[in-house]
Amino acid sequence: YKGEKPAVIDFYATWCGPCRMVAPLLKSLAKEYKDQIVVYKVDTDKQKELSAAMGIQSLPTIIFIPKTGQPQIIIGAANKTTFRKAIEEVLLKE
């Protein structure tokens, strides 16, 4: 990963109910951590090749990509506490 900040990638679809539940949580966390991380959203219906290349089979799939180390994946809807823990422990730990 070559970005300047750790990243969160949210693979979603507009028709996906759990994706719609997760979206405002990630938006809120993106604001909260705006100086520390970058949040990307990928519509799997519009970005089929990227989704296939990343092996996305279930929605939502959220990938936490640290500057160094292995990415971590959460598949399915999770709560804000779970996402915050992943940001703190995977992306921001020193």
Language model regions located:
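Non-catalytic, surface beta->alpha helical segment in thiol-disulfide oxidoreductase systems
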Residues: S58, I63-E94
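Typically the conserved alpha-helix immediately C-terminal to a functionally engaged Cys/Sec
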Residues: R20-Y33
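Conserved acidic residues
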Residues: D43-D45
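Structural micro-motif
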Residues: A7, K48, M54-I65
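The canonical Cys-X-X-Cys-His
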Residues: C16-C19, I62
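A short beta-strand-turn-helix
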Residues: Y1-A7
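Aromatic-flanked redox-active Cys/Sec active sites in thiol-based oxidoreductases
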Residues: D10-W15
